[in-house]
Regions:
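Domain-level recognition of nuclease-like catalytic cores that cleave nucleotide substrates
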Residues: 69-147
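Short, structured loop/turn "capping" segments at alpha-beta junctions
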Residues: 3-4, 29-32, 61-68
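Short, conserved, surface-exposed binding loops centered on an aromatic residue
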Residues: 13, 23-26, 65-66
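Short, flexible loop/turn motifs enriched in small residues
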Residues: 14-18
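Conserved catalytic cores of phosphodiester-cleaving nucleases, focusing on short active-site segments
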Residues: 19-42, 48-57
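A short acidic/basic microdomain associated with nuclease active sites
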Residues: 1-13
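Histidine- and/or cysteine-centered catalytic micro-motif in compact active-site loops
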Residues: 9, 36-39, 78
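Short, charged, amphipathic alpha-helix that recurs within catalytic cores of restriction-modification
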Residues: 46-64, 73, 89-90
Length: 149
């Protein structure tokens, strides 16, 4: 299985920041950099940020005592029409940076192969057992208007 660290911080070579989810698959020596975005803003900045973190991942892995034989990169985007439109508007940029899509990414995560990959997939909000959205997410509440007589 995978061992994960959420918000893995780094300060290397004058660069500071954090990786949303840094993971390792001990059996294969793979390290995965997972950038999680609720939505996509600047496509170029997003890709450059993931590239920078992937470049620093072997150093971070070494400091954690992890063996690193390869780094895979994933961009995980919140499901939604706006996110899909923004990815589609910059399809060539995202396809070049993240060659694989959702099903292929999930398959690799379940059973990593010998080669590192890069992929983009959309993730829907968590659902509870009754099928509703996760209640831990803050709900929008509208104040009631005063009634007039």
């Amino acid at each position: 299985g995978w061992e994960v660290i959420a918000e893995a911080t780094f300060s290397e070579f004058g660069e500071r920041g954090s990786i949303d989810v840094l993971a390792r698959h001990e059996a294969t020596g793979h390290v995965a950099v997972n950038e999680v975005k609720a939505s996509i803003g600047d496509a170029g900045a997003t890709v450059m940020g993931v590239d920078r973190k992937a470049r620093l991942a072997p150093v971070m892995a070494g400091k954690l005592g992890w063996r690193c034989l390869g780094v895979s990169r994933f961009l995980v985007v919140g499901e939604g029409a706006t996110s899909r439109r923004r990815v589609a508007a910059h399809a060539e940029t995202f396809r070049t940076a993240f060659a694989l899509a959702g099903p292929e990414c999930r398959s690799w995560i379940r059973q990593p192969t010998s080669r590192p990959i890069s992929g983009l997939f959309f993730l829907s909000p968590a659902r509870t057992e009754d099928g509703n959205r996760d209640s831990r997410r803050p709900a929008s509440v509208r104040p009631q208007r005063p009634r007039t007589g």
